[in-house]
Regions:
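N-terminal accessory/cap region of cofactor-dependent oxidoreductases and related radical enzymes
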Residues: 1-297, 301, 320, 324-482, ...
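Mobile, glycine-rich extracellular loop/lid and propeptide segments
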Residues: 303, 311-314
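Alpha-helical scaffold segments that form or flank carboxylate-/histidine-based iron centers
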Residues: 314-320
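Residue-level "edge-of-site" marker
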Residues: 500, 513
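Extracellular/luminal domains of secretory-pathway glycoproteins
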Residues: 506-510
């Protein structure tokens, strides 16, 4: 009763403060109260279920899954049975939910879909003229969020039978490889794969899409979202024909590197294998390798206390621990690095430790069932009235491609001398593995940890990704910036002003209010005509350079509202982070591993020689100290 009353008061305070003065201008305690109040309001109004006919999993068999596999003790490979009463919830193949009312979530069609032209939006507002860095962060911060997104979501293969044709202007040299004097364009983009589960019950409702990965924060980017995928990485050389490791570990080679993906070698030579290995680059290679090694280290620790346990038991318990550690790192390290202010750090770390703080949590364990007091882990599971799911709006605000540089410099971790340089193409897909031919794993990790990522502002989208070769032999290229704009429209994500309205935020009424940069005000007016037409991604990047931008934040306040809601939801809805985050489920050693370790410890464990470079750095997502 008391907590409900507190929620009511905080919710009212959040609405009042939003109408009068932004929380970003309030004193610490008042700002923190407003942020918590925004979460209360968003939970009440912005968790929307899209399922109309959830699947019945009774009697289902998964090939290869041991008969004694207990979903109460372990995470199911496909994410099912996290919620024992609704076992389909959050599993791979379940629909994306929404963070806006269904009436606000209809996809744009026909001329609206291409108005204004996504390619022209890319050219005039997103093209990187010169690299705008974030000097307070390192490139591993950019790699980390892609590592997380691959855990949470994927829309799967596009529909080869449905093409969206984007016209190009006469002065637009597209595609990049066209013959001299050949006609321009158009740019053809495959439509997002349709949802085959729609029935008559979906008539008159917005378009839906299915998540091909599990919705849960279960490290599926490392472990995969199916038993078959998980099995491949437990076999010699990552080959289906390889001998299975029965010790509970992943297979790594003699250098501790990942196996190569046997299915991809013809198309993408040297492409590495992991749970999710799409859109691969050296930053992902480093993180997947680190947490594959971390899994094996956790297995070694668990075996000390459980010498007679089977390899399967060790593997699945280690997965629980590894996934929880990754979630903790994101919550208390990565997110505060991107929200580098007193209130931002407290708000996000509070998801894990509550207002009582880290020291009390580590010293006395769970001191309250209140998530505000003690943090979410260990408190009762709560879906807040809507089945758990990742959402289309969450996908939209995590379009953070501007964080990526176009150029990389690889240097020795011993003396900082330059070993070689590569562009983004030269470190992507199978080329990522070739980095280790001229630099050690430690050198590569050191190099990315001492270089800055890009800022989430206009005119800073990587040009490599704006001229991306998909099938160059067939003349198929892609402008990912234009595709980002198109996807939000295609999937029914409201445009910037409508999005803010759907979240209960104050209305932006002019381009001058949107951004403080006069040149961008002019360009935005030229491209969009009216403020209501501005796309969500463009609005968020423009907002970054305004008086409303939260101090120390790496993204806009508009995007932050979704983070407030969904960061807590990923923990609170997940049984293994809430009710079952206990020593009994994780084992005492596993539970302690999560509580006592962070990203700094993971790196020190697997690359101990790098410790002097980050020992004096407050957060390992900040730039490390240079060698020499």
């Amino acid at each position: 009763m008391l907590e409900r009353l507190l929620d009511f008061v905080l919710g009212v305070w959040a609405r009042i403060s939003d109408r009068t003065i932004s929380w970003t201008r309030l004193p610490f305690l008042m700002a923190l109260a407003a942020i918590i109040g925004h979460r209360v309001n968003l939970r009440h109004h912005n968790l929307i279920d899209t399922e109309t006919a959830p699947p019945d999993l009774s009697g289902r068999k998964i090939d290869g899954l041991p008969e004694d596999f207990d979903p109460r003790e372990f995470r199911m490979p496909d994410g099912s049975y996290n919620d024992m009463k609704s076992p389909w919830m959050g599993m791979a193949g379940a629909r994306f939910g929404r963070n806006v009312a269904l009436s606000k979530g209809f996809a744009e069609r026909d001329t609206e879909l291409l108005s204004p032209n996504p390619r022209e939006v890319s050219r005039k507002l997103m093209e990187r003229k010169e690299f705008v860095p974030v000097e307070s962060l390192n490139v591993m911060a950019a790699a980390w969020i892609q590592f997380m997104v691959h855990d949470w979501l994927g829309h799967g293969a596009n529909d080869p039978k449905r093409k969206i044709e984007i016209p190009v202007q006469d002065d637009d040299l597209w595609p990049p490889n066209r013959e001299p004097n050949a006609p321009n364009g158009p740019m053809n983009v495959l439509a997002t794969g349709a949802d085959p589960s729609r029935t008559d019950a979906d008539e008159g409702r917005p378009v839906t899409f299915r998540n091909v990965e599990t919705h849960w924060w279960d490290a599926s980017q490392v472990y995969g979202s199916s038993w078959a995928r998980m099995e491949r990485m437990r076999r010699e050389g990552g080959k289906r024909s390889g001998a299975r490791l029965e010790n509970g570990k992943f297979w790594v080679d003699e250098r501790g590197l990942l196996p190569l993906d046997e299915d991809m070698q013809e198309k993408r030579p040297k492409q590495e294998l992991s749970g999710v290995n799409g859109n691969w680059w050296i930053g992902l290679s480093l993180l997947h390798t680190l947490f594959t090694r971390e899994h094996n280290a956790i297995v070694d620790r668990l075996r000390i206390d459980h010498p007679n346990a089977s390899g399967e038991w060790l593997f699945q318990k280690a997965r629980l621990v590894n996934a929880a550690l990754i979630a903790k790192i994101h919550t208390v390290e990565w997110t505060p690095a991107l929200m580098d202010s007193d209130v931002g750090r407290m708000a996000m770390r509070g998801n894990f430790y509550g207002l009582s703080g880290e020291r009390l949590a580590k010293g006395f364990g769970l001191v309250s069932d209140s998530e505000v007091v003690a943090g979410i882990p260990g408190t009762p599971t709560d879906h807040h009235g809507s089945p758990y799911a990742m959402t289309e709006e969450f996908t939209a605000v995590y379009r953070l491609h501007a964080l990526l540089p176009d150029q990389f410099e690889f240097r020795s971790s011993d003396d900082d001398r330059v070993l070689f340089e590569r562009n983004l193409t030269g470190v992507a897909f199978g080329q990522a593995r070739t980095v280790y031919d001229g630099a050690t794993f430690d050198d590569a990790l050191y190099s990315l940890s001492t270089q800055p990522p890009g800022a989430m502002v206009l005119h800073n989208f990587p040009n490599t990704l704006r001229n991306l070769s998909k099938k160059p032999e067939e003349g198929v290229f892609m402008d990912l910036a234009a595709v980002d704009i198109l996807r939000d429209r295609e999937r029914g994500v409201p445009r910037y002003c409508a999005f803010r309205e759907a979240l209960g935020m104050p209305k932006i009424t002019s381009f001058e209010e949107l951004t403080s940069v006069e040149a961008d005000q002019k360009l935005l007016r030229e491209v969009y005509g009216t403020i209501d037409r501005v796309d969500l991604l463009i609005g968020c990047m423009a907002e970054f350079q305004s008086s409303r931008q939260p101090k120390g934040f790496g993204f806009s306040d508009t995007a932050f509202r979704i983070f407030i809601l969904m960061a807590s939801r990923r923990l609170k809805s997940d049984r293994f982070f809430s009710t079952d985050f206990t020593p009994e489920i994780y084992t005492p050693a596993g539970y302690s591993w999560v509580q006592s370790n962070g990203f700094r410890d993971v790196i020190r464990r697997h690359s101990p020689a790098l410790a002097p470079h980050f020992d004096d750095v407050r957060n390992v997502f900040y730039p490390w100290d240079r060698a020499g």
